[in-house]
């Protein structure tokens, strides 16, 4: 799957009011999920220097994700081109990488 991820951060001064409003709008509360994230790079940190990321994540599913700068940058928000695939075996994929 390929898409553009846009990261937006907000200063929240009244978290409880926001939480209540979201619940009024019908939010579906999910339980917390612990996730394991592993980043991979070469000894020269080539991915990091090129503002890219290769990550293996385990939570409810196992996913391998590659993030890089998008072809068209957004001056207002932090954006990444993101490629992601589901992986059936976390441990084996870790060994491959």
Q: What are the residue ranges of the model-derived segments?
A:
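N-terminal strand-loop-strand beta-hairpin
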Residues: 1-96
């Amino acid at each position: 799957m390929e898409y553009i991820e846009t990261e937006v951060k907000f200063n929240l001064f009244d978290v409880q009011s926001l939480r209540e409003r979201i619940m009024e709008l019908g939010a579906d509360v999910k339980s917390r999920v612990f996730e394991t994230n592993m980043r991979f790079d070469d000894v020269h940190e080539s991915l990091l220097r090129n503002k890219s990321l290769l990550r293996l994540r385990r939570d409810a599913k196992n996913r391998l994700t590659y993030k890089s700068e998008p072809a068209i940058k957004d001056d207002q928000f932090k954006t990444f081109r993101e490629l992601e695939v589901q992986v059936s075996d976390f441990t084996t994929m870790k060994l491959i990488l």
